[in-house]
Regions:
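Conserved nucleotide-binding/hydrolysis micro-motifs of P-loop NTPases
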Residues: 32, 48, 94-95, 118-121, ...
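N-terminal, positively charged nucleic-acid-binding surface of large information/translation enzymes
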Residues: 63-73, 77-78, 128, 134, ...
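Conserved C-terminal guanine-recognition region of P-loop GTPase G domains, centered on the G4
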Residues: 105, 111-173
Length: 300
């Protein structure tokens, strides 16, 4: 019998093949085109039907962010491309949210550094990039807005290399691929002078260069790194499964920072799919999930 969720819907089977998962964090200064890029990545993943309009500010849907134009509470979206699931993890763009930066980056296995072809790397992204390099994430550099007048993509690429070198990047991290393009005009390429007609070059490079998460066997374990909220089910715990496999309806132990432990039950298990979530039967090590039914949890 196929399990159902709390609404009675049948659950999807979630295969435990981490080779088909890529967890990637996006690091970008405000106005360097992060939201537009994610829009186009979602489109390339065929997540929008022809009759759907792509709304702006997919990631920036927090009221405070709309006012300030920065991303504070990290969001997760996911695309499927060439039989691979790419979990896109948004990062806070300011060091003011340092605690969240580290938690969010620990869900990723690589990062996209998005840089404006005219402005180059900005001081606000230095903190997040430094944290990403320190925990060993492999970077892909995307130099965006190369269609801007008077931009200088080659100089920006050199500035990014110098920044990473000064942040003590390893030799492997310094061997990063650089991708040029215009998210607004929906193209990415290995040469800024040679536009293409889509952004699949970027998606192919993510699959090729960013390592798949490792599947670690054992008792299931997850660090809650962020929360979502639904008026229907309340607080939702979000995190990357570190070890083992969680199943829908499973009894678990919630460990708090003070060392106390409480028995809980997973009422619904979800993975991210497009801009939303999909109820699943199980989630294995390496994937990012959202758990419903966990009461009194703490982030981190």
């Amino acid at each position: 019998m196929q399990p159902t969720n709390i609404s009675g819907e049948k659950l999807a089977y979630q295969p435990h093949n981490t080779m088909n998962i890529r967890n990637i964090a996006i690091i970008a200064h405000v106005d360097h085109g992060k939201t537009t890029l994610v829009d186009k990545m979602l489109l390339a993943g065929k997540l929008f039907r022809d009759n759907q309009n792509t709304g702006e500010l997919i990631l920036d849907n927090n009221d405070l962010e709309r006012e300030r134009g920065i991303t504070i509470t990290s969001k997760n979206v996911s695309i499927e491309y060439k039989d691979c699931k790419i979990n896109i993890i948004d990062t806070p763009g300011h060091s003011d949210f340092g605690g969240e930066v580290e938690r969010v980056l620990n869900m990723a296995d690589g990062c996209l550094l998005l840089v404006d072809a005219f402005e180059g790397p900005m001081p606000q992204t230095r903190f997040v990039l430094q944290k990403a390099l320190q925990i060993g994430l492999l970077p892909i550099v995307v130099i965006n807005k190369v269609d801007k007048p008077n931009c200088h993509p080659d100089e920006v690429q050199n500035a990014v290399f110098e920044l990473m070198f000064n942040l003590d990047a390893t030799e492997e991290q310094l061997n990063f691929p650089t991708i040029y393009g215009s998210a607004k005009n929906n193209w990415m390429s290995d040469d800024w002078k040679t536009p293409t007609d889509n952004i699949t070059y970027l998606l192919d490079k993510i699959i090729e260069y960013i390592p798949a998460p490792k599947f670690i066997e054992g008792a299931p374990q997850m660090l809650i790194t962020s929360l979502d909220y639904s008026s229907y089910v309340g607080r939702i715990a979000v995190g990357k499964v570190h070890r083992g496999t969680f199943t829908d309806g499973q009894d678990i132990m919630l460990c708090k920072r003070d060392g106390s432990m409480t028995k809980q039950k997973i009422k619904q298990l979800n993975t991210f799919s497009g801009l939303g979530k999909t109820p699943v039967q199980s989630v294995g090590s390496g994937d990012i999930c959202a758990m419903i039914g966990i009461e009194g949890f703490e982030i981190g």
